[in-house]
């Protein structure tokens, strides 16, 4: 425990802003960047949820590992598994056999990544709303 729930909203706000960035990147045809930023959206949103629940900010960048630590549903866990694939490969040429990542990522991959990131954001925002209801009901 010992997290800082007051900062949870900051993490969630940044995740939301990053989602806007990912959407803009998609519209501009930057598909590798869209995929990477979507991984960041999910990571930051889940870190927000961890803080909200009173946990220390999760260290590391694996959406899958953060989701496991939060004992979150399979839908989010599966989204994390897919998004984690983009953390390195969407940015570094030495993470792919040949070519630059921006040349290799497709609109379909980026669209899928946006869907996964949106799913995580929706679930985390719902978690925040549920927490507010609990707090107002216990007063």
Locations of the language-model features?
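Terminal alpha-helical segments
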Residues: 1-139
